[in-house]
Amino acid sequence: MSASPAKDDRKTGKKMEVLIYTKSNCPFCEKAKAWFTQHGFGYTQVLLDDEEQRLAFYQRISNGREVRSVPQIFIDDKHIGTYNDLMAISDTLIKKQGGLMEFSETYKPFHYPWAVEITTRHEKAHWIEDELDLSEDVADWKGGKITPVEKEYIINILRLFTQSDVAVGQNYYDQFIPKFKNNEIRNMLGSFAAREGIHQRAYALLNETLGLPDSEYHAFLEYSEMADKIEYMRKADTNTLRGLGLSLAKSVFNEGVALFASFVMLLNFQRFGKMKGMGKVVEWSIRDESIHVEGNSKLFKAFVKEHSRVVDDEFKKEIYEMSKDIVDLEDKFIDLAYAMGSIEGLEKSEVKEYIKYITDRRLLQLGMKPNFKVKENPLPWLEWVLNGADHTNFFENRVTEYEVAGLSGNWDDAYAA
């Protein structure tokens, strides 16, 4: 007899007792054990390799019907039957246990404690746009410190940035929160969605402080490189389990790749003591989006564990195609941003290589294999800038000196797999 830990009944807190009678070299026995393992159910296995013992067992449980095969499965002392009988009630079992897509009847016990931890960490890093000081940015902008080419470069990025955060926020409210009803998960997603609203207001404040007209908020529609990005970020079909899983994967690319190209291009100015208020917005946003990517990656893994039947070679292929699509869209946007000329300290080719690097990191976070084979960060200065509070020779007003309620940590985490 062998056993794996029994699983809590998520609605009652009781252990679900699973007993599987098997024999050696039984493919369906292995399938049954694998199903319980994949969905987090513990079980006890009883081997019936002795034929006489097995026949006596069949007779004992027959109860008026012929029983001639293994596995034979019992749950809480109730005879379920064979592997096929298990598959017939598999969705019911998952639903009984609660799961990601079921309402939580009680606040505790927590069934996804990682989501509670991520939400707490995210809230400790809370900030609002009113905390920003953009006075030096205005002086840089109007005083000649920012060249005409740099201004057009920044404007092209800001044209899209606010709308990108609108798209990400809408995806939480429209695609995910209605589907994921577990309380811990909803609290996490709700926290993420609310922070996207702060991002929108922060970048809008930057636009307005620099004197950009309201027309810039819809100017992105005039550029296919921008409009195509927004359309791609919004496109999803969450009406099926398969579609919902793919939408979760895309959310990791939306926040962990599409936004990061713009982050890098704007953060480069921080290296030269320019646009330091903008640098604050970018750094705080990077911290937020890195937490969002972590949470959504873990949610994706939990989802495919609970609904493992959606995962096949075609499902994986679609995610790899998604990663290629996001890189292609970013390449076109980067070309547009650099259309007016080069930028001090950051070549277009470097940004494109970085996008491939960060996309591979996101694939790893999803449990996939790297697709672009860029193992080293092509922009090593990022770590120096993002960890600026540790460097005494950095300019005086370092953005990473900002801390609120434990807003501290290693910036390398933003780029870790």
Per-range role (PLM):
Residues 11-46:
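Local sequence-structure signature of Cys/Sec-based thiol-disulfide redox active-site neighborhoods
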